[in-house]
Amino acid sequence: RGLILRGIKMWNEEMIINLFFQKHKKERLLWELSTNKREEALKSLHDLKYVKKEIMHPIPYYTEKYLEKELKKFGNFTNVYYMGLSYTGMLPLKKAIERSREEDEGCIIYCGEGIGYCHTDHEEGAPLAYLLKVKNYRDIEKNYDCTFGTEGIEEWMLHE
């Protein structure tokens, strides 16, 4: 058995909150994520009224394969940071997209380079889906230790 994930760029929740969410809501969300209100905070992440409107670009609720293809137009994203009620952490892009389809409450996927995806539940029809594009992502990412490593990676991802 060998390590198949080497040099994975690691992100964290605080950086993702700072990239995608409105200034007046960031501090509260970060506090809630670090307390026993975590589940409540994760639910509120998917309330799109707190996402910066200028970075939200509506897209159709694509099939898994097509969504992967669309996200890869912006970069060769292999591993992403996934935030949902059932799981939060690093995943391969394909697994993150598969998992996103299982989240009733919605999710956020951060691919890197200021590119993300989110969807939220919708009362009728397909969920509302958005491509998230942050132009000044380098200014925000530089304040965080986005180290390369395997911390937070599930065991099944580390072995052949």
Report each predicted region and the residues it spans.
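Structured alpha/beta or helical-core interaction and ligand-binding surfaces enriched in interleaved
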Residues: 1-160
